[in-house]
Amino acid sequence: MAKDNTQMTTEDMQQTIYKELGYKSYPFPFTTPAYLEAYGALVGLNTPPAKTARVLELGATYGGNIISQAVFNSEATFVGIELSQDQVEKGNQIISDAKLDNVSLIQGNILNFEESMGTFDYIIAHGFYSWISDEMKDKLLNIISSHLADNGIAYVSYNTYPGWHTMEEVRQLMLFANRDQDNLTHKEKVLRGKTVGSLVGAQILNYDNLKERNSKFLGALRSVMQKDDYYVGHDHLEPHNDPCYFYQFNDHLKAHAFRKSIICKASAAKDINYAIANPAEVNTIPVRTTVNSFVFQILFDEEALEMFENELVRDTFQALIKDGGTFNMIEAFAILKAAHEAAHASNDELEPAVCSLYKAVVEHMVRGGIRFYKTFPVKEEYMEGLSYIPARFTNFVKAIVHGGSEYMYGADMFNDAIGDISEEDLLFMELLNKPKAKSTVIKKIKEALFSADQSQTTKHQNAMAEAFYNELTTRMEHLGFVRSKKTGSIS
């Protein structure tokens, strides 16, 4: 992509904010090819296979969203476009350190996006649309229109009204606090904005009538005060932060020949089936057949189970959560049927419970309480003498631990952020570069971490090393780093 040498003043300001405040690039689980593939299937689209997808991210920053995806999707290809040369260089250094060959970052302005980039199965623009000018918004949708594969999907996130009306009041307060303060650095402006915000909030809390009338504002203000400085600087002090109503975004899509609600090519729209969104059709055979094709991951915990009115459905979800939260509908139905039999309920009660189960699953698929996949991320149990950690994952963690954590988070197989990747993780992963006996690994752990501590007895050192081993094998399973020679699923 050709480098832009005539960047606008607002872009210069944005880059100055990035440099002064820093920025940590996040992974986002709802942007992965596996999730977008499933979302397309949910509404009847024959989306490209996630395993071999070609993915473009616009506004990729350091690449924290797609680098982690590239780690877990070795046959897919990822390209990120980012305006900041500094972020591209640092992100590409992390890619190099991680020894990844299926992801790259390119410096450039999307206004100069080159046609030679080709087509992509999935296009991501997370945290981008609301922070750019109207001209760039049009260009973003033009890029998607021209470069999205015929059956591909684009993911575009944006700030929406009416929710952002309250948050916008906080932004305006931040901007007001820094009026005529051009001499301050952006870090100083964030501090000043937070200070003024705290003073305003404290004054409101002194008066019961004001506190009651401004409860939404106080909630938004409290949320912002607790955020990191870089977040406050980017969300509330950048020159562009342009929320819109959902219908306004849809109208913008329509102007670029996209379908409303799901960003796909008009040629693919004929296959879209919106029955899944109609509560009256949730228990029809076509919708049940679609739901039965997914593997699910529950995101809520047992404390939230009271939201289910049907006791059998509540018991089913409780059992699924206790079993790890991953399930398909055959497993869920078997648990529900067992709960029905254990309760000695009448046969007339079973079908209503099944209907309630499907309704609950679909509702939480839409609301985000349950993730769903056609291609479920690989997660294997650790087996002594058979399991190991492939170099692909170890190199990624090494790149994060040895400097990359300043700019991005690590991520697990679902692309959820890992905020606590450590040298201990790296040590364990390097020890398990191939299948080894438990005793061999524990001996190495003891030598590396505990043998220098002369205050501990040998017995105590052995116990600590074994506890470390047990904890880390479970952690590696949970993160999706474990592979086994026996299963042949080596990455």
Model feature map: region roles:
Residues 114-123:
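A short acidic, Gly/Pro-enriched loop at the edge of an enzyme's catalytic core
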Residues 138-150:
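A short glycine-rich, Lys/Arg-flanked "PGG" loop and its adjoining helix->strand segment in the class I
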Residues 158-183, 203:
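Conserved class I S-adenosyl-L-methionine
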Residues 20, 24-52:
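Conserved alpha-helix/loop element of class I SAM-dependent methyltransferases that forms part
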Residues 259-264, 299-491:
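Long, charge-rich, low-complexity alpha-helical segments
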Residues 151-159:
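Conserved beta-strand signature within the Rossmann-like core of class I S-adenosyl-L-methionine
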Residues 62-75:
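Conserved SAM-binding loop of SAM-dependent methyltransferases across substrates and taxa
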Residues 223-325, 333, 339-350:
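C-terminal lobe and adjacent flexible extensions of AdoMet/dcAdoMet transferase-like proteins
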